[in-house]
Amino acid sequence: MKLQQNFTDNNSIKYTCILILIAFAFSVLCRLYWVAWASEFYEFFFNDQLMITTNDGYAFAEGARDMIAGFHQPNDLSYFGSSLSTLTYWLYSILPFSFESIILYMSAFFASLIVVPIILIAREYKLTTYGFIAALLGSIANSYYNRTMSGYYDTDMLVLVLPMLILLTFIRLTINKDIFTLLLSPVFIMIYLWWYPSSYSLNFAMIGLFGLYTLVFHRKEKIFYLTIALMIIALSMLAWQYKLALIVLLFAIFAFKEEKINFYMIWALIFISILILHLSGGLDPVLYQLKFYVFKASDVQNLKDAAFMYFNVNETIMEVNTIDPEVFMQRISSSVLVFILSFIGFILLCKDHKSMLLALPMLALGFMALRAGLRFTIYAVPVMALGFGYFLYAFFNFLEKKQIKLSLRNKNILLILIAFFSISPALMHIYYYKSSTVFTSYEASILNDLKNKAQREDYVVAWWDYGYPIRYYSDVKTLIDGGKHLGKDNFFSSFVLSKEQIPAANMARLSVEYTEKSFKENYPDVLKAMVKDYNKTSAKDFLESLNDKDFKFDTNKTRDVYIYMPYRMLRIMPVVAQFANTNPDNGEQEKSLFFSQANAIAQDKTTGSVMLDNGVEIINDFRALKVEGASIPLKAFVDIESITNGKFYYNEIDSKAQIYLLFLREYKSFVILDESLYNSSYIQMFLLNQYDQDLFEQITNDTRAKIYRLKR
């Protein structure tokens, strides 16, 4: 095909398809860089393929694996039948690639589809070339790349593509009044809700804004009102078969009998659609939010009356913490300058093309990251990318109005240079963003070996970070995972890992048996059920009773319980312990925990003191610590020569002190911790290899992870 010399004015279908293919290939190739880099490390491989880089991905991988097998265990929390698991199952059924290869590369290809709606939206405004530049930028912007790179096997791979397709149908409808687009809008909403159920609020906001836009700009056009009615039906909680049948039926009636449909019928249809939405429970999420904020005080009081109080998991998750404005701008547009130009361009785009206002819900959700956490930034990426593309158009248009003459050749060269420099920060980010796999091959092998020792109904007690991978590799059940980690859920695993071995063993058995019972009894609070069944007046009294080695269980043992203790958990030990350090009766912290892991960075040859990378100094021949100028005596210095053999040297220094200093020779790392954490089951059983053989049997003994079977 011979391209026009002034390609910025070309909006032909062939030209558009070529740009889409180029942008798609560019996006995929950028995501393959990580594969090339990671392939150099054998510890990232398992079963002859690179492993994935996201914990949540193992949930969908487990679901897909179970779908391929054709079954899963009752109450095993498998994502059997979930959207991504289903799509993976379909691909595995028709493609000649291994399961591991499919889940590794899916995000690279599906996430790159974002270029399609970006370029097509720009084409609706006769700005295809500028849309191409926007697609290049948006497809690899920092936050979007981070959550859709190769190996990032998660629903994020389509979480922007689908709402952008919805936005495309909105814009196309406002410009062309295309009746086929009338059908696409509700269909894309249905697909988006199936793919990502949490998209309900965004869908609701987009439909609401489209309704407001209709009343302001298209109040006399029937096709817009019918679109609203069909989208409301798509948003309802009816089974998808009924929704699709109803949508197609109404579409067909409008397509063939439009002249006989008046506004009274349209408004009646909208009323019926809202009624269907309400009766099917579609308004419940909205009503819940209103109830929570309007009647907040009484709701909180009722919550206190109904259950115990636990540590809030949101305080431990980086993605829900507020972020620095500069980081916010870089995550959306890869650089501060491009972000500013993109924002200006978006304002100009909305000024010149009112239909772009329909993108505000996505932009607002992305900007929520300033308060709600960095995970939301991706929603603003494609909208701001379109803003940048339009800024370039406005810039060249400004030059023409000022009669600044540029030849077509110079204009094209300048446009290419601007495009290159705008995406350069994103390319640099891709080069330096070298994410590791969730587990190493050694850790995956340890869990895979457990599959041959444990039964599918057995439980592995571990921290929630490892729940999904454990279920995937070991094919067992877990108490908590990436989707089940509220304070009341985390309490039990935290207790088992951070308390001494006797209460930990008792709680491990109780938490598993009561979790299984809760599937039938539907306990709102499992700990409260324990307290009630054992006739205790408070959670504190019940938890203290677990210190008895002869504790009598009222429940029968129904399965084996394993405890997974990886080395990688050591760095987050204070977070793990925080949940069980909270008194469920009043929500207060029982004690102030002290824990830090650090490496030596320098040694004073004169005094012999050792400076650690956390700012702490080891002084007086390893007998005290210097923290912010204050000297803190040590209770003991423990030199751990071998984690697997339990070979260590215990040097008591001050029996009245509370702080221990541990040196891990195998990792060349220091651990500073208080007495309660030193006596915890995790430190004793993993680092020191000291375990009560009446309570536990060691199944796996490795420097990377240990697994114990509960004998109780």
Swiss-Prot record:
- Cell membrane in keyword set: yes
**What residue ranges lie in the Cytoplasmic compartment?**
1-12, 125-127, 177-178, 218-222, 257-262, 351-355, 400-407
The subcellular location is: Cell inner membrane
Q: Residue numbers of motif TIXE motif?
A: 316-319
Q: Name one Pfam family in it.
A: STT3
| Residues the record lists as binding Mn(2+) | D56, D154, E319
Give the reactions, separated by semicolons, that this protein catalyses.
tritrans,heptacis-undecaprenyl diphosphooligosaccharide + [protein]-L-asparagine = tritrans,heptacis-undecaprenyl diphosphate + a glycoprotein with the oligosaccharide chain attached by N-beta-D-glycosyl linkage to protein L-asparagine
Q: Where is this motif: WWDYG motif?
A: 463-467
Q: Name one GO molecular function term.
A: magnesium ion binding
Q: Which family does it belong to?
A: Belongs to the STT3 family.
Q: What is this protein called?
A: Undecaprenyl-diphosphooligosaccharide--protein glycotransferase
In which organism is this protein found?
A: Campylobacter lari (strain RM2100 / D67 / ATCC BAA-1060)
Q: Which gene encodes it?
A: pglB
